[in-house]
């Protein structure tokens, strides 16, 4: 198995104005790295200019950033991965520090943190600022963590993270999925504060504030259900139980006063709603036990991957 020491992964869609500079900057700060540009059906000269700058250019024909990342993670083997967008909004000067945290300090994911520096002043799209803050707050509360930038497109990964990450999303919600995967599996997450700069003039963002924002929030709910089923279904059970109690109180009150059940259909609906609440609660318990089993299997898989990586490194040295 051929394994790169450092692989720089650049997903691109119509980035002809910036991709050449991003590749050159990556080569300058990481001269020993192999730089891969994955072209996602660009209609401009992105692939041509990336190859001219010295990158290995490959194509992903299924549209969407999640699909590109799935292809990259499947095809590239490396001890350390740097993933950066091709829009020149992230400084490559931070890459060596991020690599060091993976290779020397055993980090599984290093987050290029924009939100602790210049993002809110440089970014000219106010709803993006609100969305980033909302997503960060939601995930940190739901998953009891303290990740400073959930949506950043600038990250470093270990081999173990890349080869265990199941890519389920197809679009920009992929960053949220990565963060939750690392948090839920107790992977080591480090942070590097970076200076964010807005896109250069003539370079348009591919992120749709509203539709992609809804997808991200939907992904958070889905992953909370999948990774924290006890919490999710307990909340659902509580809501159903409260609803049943609210509507059954007038029925019970009327029965005490008159000795008759005047709203029999309401009583039946409340009974079924309470049964649904109990089912939701016990479903959460069952799924929580299944999740625990999956965690045990994941740890075994992680150990096997670590041995596989060490064998690959030894082969490279020989």
Residue ranges, per PLM feature:
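Acceptor/aglycone-binding surface of glycosyltransferases and processive sugar-polymer synthases
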Residues: 61-75, 80, 92-172, 176, ...
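Active-site acidic short loop of glycosyltransferases
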Residues: 3, 32, 76-79
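Hydrophobic helical membrane-anchoring modules
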Residues: 2, 169, 174-318
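Donor nucleotide-sugar binding loop of glycosyltransferases
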Residues: 15-18, 42, 65, 91
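A conserved acidic beta->alpha catalytic loop
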Residues: 39-47
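Cell-envelope/extracellular polymer assembly enzymes that use nucleotide-activated donors
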Residues: 5-7, 34, 177
């Amino acid at each position: 198995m051929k394994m790169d020491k450092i692989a720089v992964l650049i997903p691109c869609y119509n980035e002809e104005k910036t991709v050449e500079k991003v590749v050159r900057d990556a080569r300058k700060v990481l001269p020993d790295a192999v730089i891969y540009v994955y072209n996602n059906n660009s209609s401009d000269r992105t692939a041509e200019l990336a190859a001219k700058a010295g990158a290995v250019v490959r194509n992903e024909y299924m549209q969407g950033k999640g699909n590109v990342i799935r292809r990259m993670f499947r095809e590239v083997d490396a001890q350390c991965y740097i993933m950066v967008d091709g829009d020149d909004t992230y400084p490559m000067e931070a890459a060596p520090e991020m690599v060091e945290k993976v290779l020397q300090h055993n980090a599984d994911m290093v987050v290029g943190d924009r939100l602790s520096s210049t993002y809110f002043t440089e970014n000219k799209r106010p709803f993006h600022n609100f969305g980033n803050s909302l997503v960060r707050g939601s995930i940190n509360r739901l998953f009891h963590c303290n990740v400073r930038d959930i949506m950043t497109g600038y990250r470093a990964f270990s081999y173990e993270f890349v080869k265990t990450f199941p890519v389920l999303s197809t679009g920009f919600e992929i960053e949220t999925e990565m963060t939750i995967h690392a948090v839920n599996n107790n992977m080591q997450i480090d942070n590097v504060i970076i200076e964010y700069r807005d896109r250069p003039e003539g370079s348009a963002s591919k992120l749709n504030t509203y539709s992609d924002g809804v997808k991200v929030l939907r992904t958070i709910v889905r992953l909370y259900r999948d990774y924290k089923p006890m919490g999710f279904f307990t909340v659902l059970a509580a809501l159903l139980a409260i609803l049943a109690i609210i509507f059954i109180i007038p029925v019970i009150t009327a029965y005490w006063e008159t000795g008759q059940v005047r709203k029999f259909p309401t009583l039946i609906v409340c009974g079924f709603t309470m049964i649904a609440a109990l089912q939701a609660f016990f479903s959460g318990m069952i799924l929580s036990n299944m999740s625990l089993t999956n965690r045990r299997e994941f740890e075994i898989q992680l150990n096997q991957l670590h041995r596989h990586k060490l064998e690959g490194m030894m082969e490279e040295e020989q």
